[in-house]
A protein has these predicted regions:
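Conserved C-terminal helix/tail region of periplasmic/extracytoplasmic solute-binding proteins
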Residues: 391-519
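Hinge/lid segment of periplasmic solute-binding proteins
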Residues: 30, 97-152, 174, 192-197, ...
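Extracytoplasmic "Venus flytrap"
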Residues: 35-52, 149, 207
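Extracytoplasmic "Venus flytrap"/periplasmic binding protein-like
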Residues: 57-128, 158-164, 171, 272-273, ...
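Extracytoplasmic/periplasmic substrate-recognition and gating elements
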Residues: 56, 61, 85, 134-140, ...
Length: 519
């Protein structure tokens, strides 16, 4: 009996061991770590290569492989929207333009980061950048600043020196206008016969249009939107201060200081003309400065004309409310559906001070870290930019901003369309355009509050901004502005020859008809 009992125990023991062995969890084996994917946009020259250099150090440190996917800005919105809404093929960490953060946050598609704020340390970042990490009036943080896109006046040092123009000469709007006239009046031509012009900017075919208007509007106390008495956002396009700032910016074209040829170009084309040494001033991102230090084979501008001429960054000329430049940039975020703890580790790695310093120096954008910016202040070409962060402004962080920005693009495009033919310029038409799109902004904000500015009130502010006085017959005329010469008209993009020919033909036709009738 004892033998039988012992035999049964042995068999049972073997069976149980076999069962447990069969069900042993495979996790005991070394787990294979998935790679982490980062989505970015084209930041500076060779964006993928530059980020991969930083991520190589991360892989060396952690053993986790990474993959960088570069999305063109034109496709980025749709790709990101699809990935975040569906959760299919979404990245682990992604770059978002600062104005995109509120939209995806409001949809619950990017992960709240408040739990990790001690590791992030908000006090490290400049306020204007940290304010873009969340929705306006909300305390939930959804992203971490990566770099700052600040847009100052960029000046060609050689052209300024040739015309004896100093930085303090263009500190005010009137001073800037005088400098523009001085360069235009010099009638300089380059070796290839190209005329040097003072200032140019893109218009109706460019998504940067609101960014171009914003500094001149903000510097005169205006804004695209504002809160009403109930604390709700509403359109502010037809407020006197906004109108004043818009008129000041349009005056560059109305006073033939800027060629209407530029109105057919986009930002890339304008920058190309600046890089070719054909423009004294543009308003653009600071990356151009860094590119002049990078060899051409690496995507830089070191051996180009602008590399030889050199670039100087200057504040936006002061308006009635000071000098306020546009500030944008990009933040890093994690999709809500991402369950990898390593994704947060990678985000923290990319936004630590060491990496912010190294990466921004490669792409030429400003870092958002106060400590890193202190070092940048020692750079002769960048030190003028750092103080601008204290007075510059970013767009209001609301979910509707993306749609509002598209409305603003359409509005300013319509205005530029109207200004293409100077003879058809009409204040009534400008007012009509602003009123139409102001109503569209209010509709998007679900605010039915009327702007209340009558045409007479609009006209009064418009004339004040453009230095227009009324004659006894109530016919406006512009003062303090000399009549443009034929050369200035040609420089502005207006060619009088076809008009003279057309008028001559018309007069000849009328004269022939009269003679025929007399017979």
């Amino acid at each position: 009996m004892k033998v039988v009992t012992k035999l049964i125990c042995i068999i049972t023991s073997i069976a149980v061991s076999t069962i447990f062995a069969a069900k042993a969890p495979q996790a005991k084996q070394a787990a294979k770590q998935d790679s982490l994917t980062v989505w970015i946009m084209p930041n500076g020259a060779s964006p993928q290569e530059k980020l991969e250099q930083r991520l190589h150090l991360y892989t060396k440190k952690t053993g986790i492989k990474t993959k960088v996917v570069v999305l063109d800005w034109g496709e980025a919105w749709n790709r990101i929207t699809t990935a975040l809404s569906s959760g299919v093929d979404a990245p682990d960490v992604l770059q978002l333009g600062t104005t995109w953060v509120p939209y995806f946050a409001s949809r619950g598609e990017i992960k709240p980061l408040n739990e990790w704020l001690p590791q992030i340390d908000p006090s490290r970042f400049v306020p204007v950048s940290w304010n873009t990490t969340h929705i306006d009036s909300d305390t939930t943080i959804y992203s971490v600043p990566w770099f700052i896109d600040i847009r100052p006046i960029l000046a060609n040092k050689r052209i300024l020196k040739k015309n004896n123009i100093k930085p303090e000469d263009i500190a005010t709007f009137d001073g800037f206008v005088k400098a523009i006239r001085k360069v235009n009046d010099s009638h300089e031509t380059l070796d290839d016969g190209t005329k040097v012009r003072a200032f140019a900017f893109p218009s109706k075919i460019d998504w940067n249009i609101p960014h171009n208007f914003a500094p001149w509007m903000w510097s005169n106390g205006g804004d695209f939107i504002a809160k009403d008495q109930e604390g709700k956002w509403k359109a502010n396009v037809l407020s006197p201060k906004t109108i004043y700032g818009i008129a000041k910016y349009l005056s560059f074209v109305l006073d033939t200081l800027v060629s209407t040829d530029a109105l057919q170009m986009n930002t890339a084309q304008i920058v190309q003309h600046f890089n070719a040494g054909e423009l004294a001033f543009i308003v653009n991102t600071s990356e151009v400065i860094m590119q002049t230090r990078i060899e051409g084979e690496k995507g830089g501008l070191l051996n180009t004309r602008i590399g030889n001429d050199s670039v100087m960054a200057l504040p936006i000329p002061k308006g009635t409310e000071g000098s306020i430049c546009f500030i944008g940039g990009s933040n890093l975020a994690i999709p809500t559906g991402n369950k990898k703890p390593e994704a947060l580790d990678l985000l923290l790695y990319l936004t630590n001070d060491e990496n912010l310093d190294a990466y921004t120096k490669q792409i030429g954008m400003l870092p958002a870290s106060k400590k890193v910016l202190a070092n940048w202040s020692k750079d002769d070409d960048y030190k003028t930019l750092v103080p601008m962060l204290g007075t510059g402004r970013a767009y209001t962080a609301i979910p509707e901003w993306g749609d509002i920005e598209q409305i603003l693009v359409a509005m300013f495009s319509a205005i530029w369309d109207h200004l293409e033919i100077p003879a058809l310029y009409s204040e009534e038409k400008i007012y009509e355009i602003l009123t139409k799109y102001s109503n569209e902004i209010n509709k998007r904000l679900n605010n039915r509050t009327p702007d209340g500015l009558t045409f007479a009130e609009f006209r009064e502010t418009w004339h004040k901004a453009l230095n227009i006085k009324e004659t006894k017959k109530n016919t406006p005329h512009i003062t303090k502005q000399p009549a443009p010469t034929t050369e200035e008209l040609e420089d502005s993009g207006f060619n009088p020859t076809p008009w003279i020919f057309a008028i001559a033909v018309l007069v000849g036709f009328i004269f022939a008809v009269i003679r025929k009738k007399k017979r």
